[in-house]
Amino acid sequence: MKKSAWGLVDAFFDKYDLVDHHIHSYNDFVSNRIQEIIDTSEPIELEQGQYTVETGKVTIEKPFIKEADGSKSKIYPTEARLRNLTYSAHMSLEMRLLKEGGSETEFEKVHIGELPVMLKSEICHLHGLGRDELIEKGEDPADLGGYFIVNASERSIVTMEEIAPNKIILERIGEEDEKRARAIVTSIRSGFRARISLEYRKPRKTGVFLRISFPYVPGELPLVILLRALGLATDQEIITSISDDFNYQMIAADDIQVSLDKLKLDSDKMEEEMDEEERREYLIRSAIKYIGNRVAKGMTEDYRIKRAEDVIDRYLLPHIGTEPDKRLEKAVYLAEMTEMLLQVISGERKPHDKDHYTNKRLRVSGDLMEDLFRVAFTSLTRDMSYRLERSLARGKEPSVKQAVRSDVLSENLKHAIATGNWVGGRAGVSQLLDRTSYMGTLSHMRRVVSPLSRSQPHFEARDLHPTQFGKICPNETPESPNCGLVKNLALMAKISEGSDPDEIEEVIKKMGVIN
């Protein structure tokens, strides 16, 4: 290699560290995402006394330790290792208790818990220190950070490889001669993940071709019934929204006929007693009632309808929105998804390659800590609400400071990082840092793990894919069942950051590209 090329490599590593993706992601989590989680969490309302707890700004201090004599002093990572401590930061949140009809009170700072600190992040005492200063603090100046110290153990959060969220993935299923295909979307909003699966298969007897499943609805629903519930009331609206192609329209028409029988409509009443608008409302309400019978069987009709609407709004394609006015937008999205699925069945469109790196996303420390903090903060607010309710029931004056148990949040965060058992039932998300050698440590910090089961073959997922070139190391993967499922980032690979689609849309609107 020419001297100039080595100079380029040196310049790259002078600017970018091998663990930058972890540190930058964690910094974003601390600076922005914690406050966003608190701001968007459900309000804390008490049943008794009509009280509401209002939250304000969160404050995160750099790590310190309180000694037995009450004095406070900075704590550095080396001391945490030697004294069997967790290297963590003190978190305070502005809170106030508001009573309906009462005067507003001032915010008070309440200690809500301890946040494990990533070494070399912005809230770490080692951030920005030079070589001599690091040596003075008992640290290896060549250590890049990017890991945690929990109960004196060094723990690293591994990068998780997942299917791209909020994107339609088309695949063929079953035998090659079977006309079966599926469209899947992993819809994500505010930490909630909803897997929506739309499947085409030939009905055994008098069933439908197109079936859809999504969270909190037992079994599968006929697609056209769901489209009606979302606002595409008439047969014509459903058919034209799915496709302009006559063959695809005929498949939809067959499903419409079967679904009408399932809805048990009063045809005479529709023809004789209703105008066009009333017929639309009747069809939409009948479809919602059908879904309600699935999600709240045996309950009153009003409750079934309310529950069905709640499930549709909150758990069907939440990335589009969770408000009732987003239903029609969801219907259009599902109709487009249906046409793509039918094109796969007819051979007009190729199914997606799930192993193509366009269809993958990497979740690093900040993303995984965000999931963990959201669940931990929800546990804290529930516990606080319970304690406040109990105080009111005993006739005591409620106090936010006394109601908050900081160990609820602290233990949730610490336990997950210490054991690797994450929210959502995932295991092995954090691991004991490999200190066999310096190269082993760097390798561990750039590890990428697939969530697929090690006991299954998954031949295609384990194979080296051409789109991994320059992103994933083609050589570094372990033998044993982990082969091909545990990978490493290429030496000069960088992980780009996702952007908020709402912000992008706003910029495009300002440029006059879309109305």
From Swiss-Prot:
Pfam families linked: RNA_pol_Rpb2_1, RNA_pol_Rpb2_2, RNA_pol_Rpb2_3
Gene Ontology cellular component list: cytoplasm; DNA-directed RNA polymerase complex
Subcellular location: Cytoplasm
Catalyses which reaction(s): RNA(n) + a ribonucleoside 5'-triphosphate = RNA(n+1) + diphosphate
Gene Ontology molecular function terms on file: DNA binding; DNA-directed RNA polymerase activity; ribonucleoside binding
Superkingdom, natural source: Archaea
GO biological process, one term: DNA-templated transcription
InterPro entries xref list: DNA-dir_RNA_pol_su2, RNA_pol_bsu_protrusion, RNA_pol_Rpb2_2, RNA_pol_Rpb2_2_sf, RNA_pol_Rpb2_3
Protein family according to the UniProt entry: Belongs to the RNA polymerase beta chain family.
PANTHER family on file: DNA-DIRECTED RNA POLYMERASE I SUBUNIT 2
UniProt function note: DNA-dependent RNA polymerase (RNAP) catalyzes the transcription of DNA into RNA using the four ribonucleoside triphosphates as substrates. The Rpo2 subunit (Rpo2N and Rpo2C in this organism) is implicated in DNA promoter recognition and in nucleotide binding.
Protein name, per record: DNA-directed RNA polymerase subunit Rpo2N
The species this protein was found in: Methanothermobacter thermautotrophicus (strain Winter) (Methanobacterium thermoautotrophicum)
Source taxonomy: Archaea, Methanobacteriati, Methanobacteriota, Methanomada group, Methanobacteria
